[in-house]
């Protein structure tokens, strides 16, 4: 077992009693329990003061520790205070989809309403709101897209930007946009807004996509003043200065959280394998510590599933009376019904061990946690604009993140945090996480700003300005894709069409081109599959069987055509079963088919949902969904025309050179083309591990590049 040494004791004052777990109770008792829980939250004692502060201040910053109740209770306080009169809504944004969904479900339960009525959520490819929704939880990116259709966000009286400390790229841009919207909401509405000629630029639900249309949302407000917009910024970080300064000295109020003392323990020496050290520490706690659930922070789905499997295996090798340990996972790609399991009490006598990504730092509160295991790492996005290379890397967490993690052990009673690194390593960590806007590809966000009529991107009022190089690279990429004209404004109609689709710009352009190549059906399927976790299931204990099954679907021409084969074959299977009268058990039958074919049923189901949603979007634009049937040459040419910025050519030594960046890259072992070594390919993902790998490949003819993207390639002499 890792050797643990007692480090500095971090003590926090707690002013509320913990909430004990309860067995299953009657509906009346459940309502009573919920009411008692709400009254016990730290924020309940300051309800009146908070409502008064919102009434007095158009901008308010609320700093409250995770578990204080700010996310679930403040919107209800404001609703009860009359902020939703005349049909207005309170919008609450989250940087993560899972938080928007779980919190909305909890608030609907507290309000005793069906989800989608008074309380609803809206995330990409999933909307439960209705005309009666007044408390709307959503991702920050979703609200940004909503601003394209309603530049004044006229339906909202209050916008609450939650988890602002997360500093996601969408949160940062949204705050800048809301700063402008607040000013324009105090002026009479006209077609000319501070964002430019937005009302006439953005198309609404018309099927005529050949030019900009008048925005119908604002027609009823022409020449009138809208009511002021209240903006509340909520953060779990005690340092709110960056937000206060950005909003001209906005007032900040603090809500005390529930916090018991947490003992911080460090390893004596660095751990060479933190996954193994995590596993050992889980069982050390289980055998030696008092009752209480364990929360483990891991970097992603692969690590979580690996540790979950290893815990299950080791449980089989210990005495039966010691096996009462229940491993549960929570990460964004997990279906919501499985995510909900972490919030339920463990069976009597069992200890839960929750395996989570950094979503559990602040976005959600899991009851029952007394022990935290923190290996000290997080998966973070990075971007090199000079090479156009974006990667997801495992990096050390920041001090702010590790403090948030430790705090999770002290919500309901004294706890312990096991940091799997020496104390001296903690002192070397960065104070806070670098804002995402400084380490990501900006093409998608710039496309949305352009659609809002904001053309001066360099001069835009970002909280933290991205590098000039990153902005220039994104503008060049959008110009190459045909989204921007030579003057830097949105190209008509392509730029407007691309901004309407809730996808990365390169995927939006792929769908537009597929309409011209008469293979829109095939591209819709491909984009849907590329938008989910791996569609293939590859269990370690049955790797050979999984490989054989994958070969059944594999196309010699590449991964995209292989994905198409899986999707089509599953479609054919479904149609046959429906024709045979098996419609009632279709989900169960589909899961069985997926298991037999080593296909990830969750990913396939998600891809189907995304396909349906994107299809609706392209039909609204005015496209007819045509199919090229078995003409894969047309489809591959469309792939080349769409993804020409990610083309790679084989070199004499067998490696590949990415044509756009000049980087030496290798075909990833999971590709069906791994051993084929084709001359030229397009790819969708470049990732850095031990080597620079390209994933999701299809073979193309190199001559197609200069033919289909002549503005970007010149034929070699």
UniProtKB/Swiss-Prot annotation:
GO terms for molecular function: ATP binding; ATP hydrolysis activity; nucleic acid binding; RNA helicase activity. ATP binds at residues 64-71. The keyword ATP-binding applies. It is found in: Nucleus; Nucleus, Nucleolus. A motif (DEAH box) lies at residues 162-165. Widely expressed but spatially and temporally regulated during development. One of its GO terms (cellular component) is nucleolus. Its main location: nucleus. It catalyses: ATP + H2O = ADP + phosphate + H(+). Residues 278-453 form the Helicase C-terminal domain. Residues 51-256 form the Helicase ATP-binding domain. Its EC number is 3.6.4.13. Keywords: ATP-binding, Helicase, Hydrolase, mRNA processing, mRNA splicing, Nucleotide-binding, Nucleus, Spliceosome, Transit peptide. One of its GO terms (biological process) is RNA splicing. Pfam families: DEAD (PF00270), HA2_C (PF21010), HA2_N (PF04408), Helicase_C (PF00271), OB_NTP_bind (PF07717). Belongs to the DEAD box helicase family. DEAH subfamily. PRP22 sub-subfamily. This is Pre-mRNA-splicing factor ATP-dependent RNA helicase DEAH10.
């Amino acid at each position: 077992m890792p050797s643990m040494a007692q480090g500095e004791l971090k003590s926090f004052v707690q002013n509320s009693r913990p909430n004990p777990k309860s067995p299953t109770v009657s509906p009346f008792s459940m309502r009573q329990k919920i009411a008692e829980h709400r009254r016990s939250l730290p924020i309940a004692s300051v309800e009146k003061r908070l409502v008064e502060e919102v009434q007095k201040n158009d901008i308010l910053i609320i700093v409250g520790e995770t578990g204080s109740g700010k996310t679930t209770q403040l919107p209800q306080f404001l609703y009860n205070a009359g902020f939703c009169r005349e049909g207005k809504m309170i919008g609450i944004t989250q940087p993560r989809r899972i938080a928007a969904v779980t919190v909305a479900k909890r608030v609907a339960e507290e309000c005793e309403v069906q989800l989608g009525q008074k309380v609803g959520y809206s995330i990409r490819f999933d909307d439960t709101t209705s005309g009666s929704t007044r408390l709307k939880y959503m991702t920050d990116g979703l609200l940004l897209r909503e601003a394209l259709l309603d530049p004044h966000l006229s339906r909202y009286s209050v916008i609450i930007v939650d988890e602002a400390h997360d500093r996601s790229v969408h949160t940062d841009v949204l705050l800048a946009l809301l700063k402008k919207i607040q000013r324009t909401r105090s002026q009479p509405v006209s077609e000319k807004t501070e964002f430019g000629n937005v009302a006439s630029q953005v198309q609404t639900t018309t099927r005529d996509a050949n030019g900009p249309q008048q925005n119908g949302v604002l027609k009823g407000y022409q020449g009138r003043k809208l009511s002021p917009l209240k903006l509340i910024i909520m953060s779990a970080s005690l340092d709110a200065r960056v937000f206060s300064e950005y909003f001209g000295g906005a007032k900040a109020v603090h809500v005390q959280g529930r916090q018991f003392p947490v003992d911080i323990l460090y390893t004596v020496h660095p751990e060479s394998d933190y996954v193994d050290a995590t596993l050992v520490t889980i069982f050390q706690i289980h055998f030696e510590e008092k009752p209480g659930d364990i929360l483990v922070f891991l970097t992603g789905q692969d690590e979580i599933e690996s540790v979950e499997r290893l815990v299950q295996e080791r449980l089989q090798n210990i005495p039966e009376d010691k096996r009462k340990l229940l491993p549960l996972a929570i990460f964004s790609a997990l279906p919501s019904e499985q995510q909900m399991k972490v919030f339920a009490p463990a069976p009597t006598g069992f200890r839960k061990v929750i395996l989570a990504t950094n979503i559990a730092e602040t976005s959600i509160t899991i009851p029952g946690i007394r022990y935290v295991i923190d290996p000290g790492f997080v998966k973070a996005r990075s971007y090199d604009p000079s090479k156009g290379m974006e990667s997801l890397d495992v990096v050390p967490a920041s001090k702010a993140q590790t403090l948030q993690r430790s705090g999770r052990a002290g919500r309901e009673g004294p706890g312990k945090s096991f940091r799997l690194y020496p104390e001296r390593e903690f002192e070397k960590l960065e104070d806070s996480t670098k804002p995402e806007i400084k380490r990501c590809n900006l093409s998608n966000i710039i496309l949305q700003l352009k659609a809002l009529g904001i053309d001066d991107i360099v001069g835009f009022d970002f909280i933290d300005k991205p590098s000039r190089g990153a902005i220039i690279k994104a503008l060049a990429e959008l110009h190459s894709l045909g989204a921007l004209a030579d003057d830097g404004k949105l190209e008509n109609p392509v730029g407007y069409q691309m901004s309407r689709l809730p996808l990365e710009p390169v995927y939006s352009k792929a769908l537009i081109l597929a309409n011209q190549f008469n293979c829109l059906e095939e591209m819709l399927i491909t984009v849907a599959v590329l938008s989910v976790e791996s569609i293939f299931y590859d269990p370690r204990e049955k790797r050979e069987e999984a490989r054989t099954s994958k070969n059944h679907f594999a196309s010699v021409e590449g991964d995209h055509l292989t994905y198409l084969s899986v999707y089509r074959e599953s479609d054919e299977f479904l149609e046959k079963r429906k024709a045979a009268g098996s419609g009632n058990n279709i989900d169960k039958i589909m899961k069985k088919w997926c298991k037999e074919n080593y296909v990830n049923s969750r990913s396939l189901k998600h891809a189907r949902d995304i396909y349906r949603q994107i299809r609706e979007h392209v039909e609204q634009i005015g496209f007819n969904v045509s199919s090229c049937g078995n003409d894969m040459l047309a489809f591959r040419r469309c792939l080349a025309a769409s993804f020409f910025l990610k083309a790679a050519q084989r070199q004499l030594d067998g490696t590949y050179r990415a044509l756009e960046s000049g980087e030496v890259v290798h075909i990833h072992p999971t590709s069906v083309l791994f051993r084929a070594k084709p001359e030229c390919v397009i790819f969708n993902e470049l990732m850095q591990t031990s080597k620079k790998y390209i994933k999701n490949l299809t073979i193309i003819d190199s001559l197609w590049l200069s033919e289909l993207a002549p503005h970007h390639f010149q034929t070699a002499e």
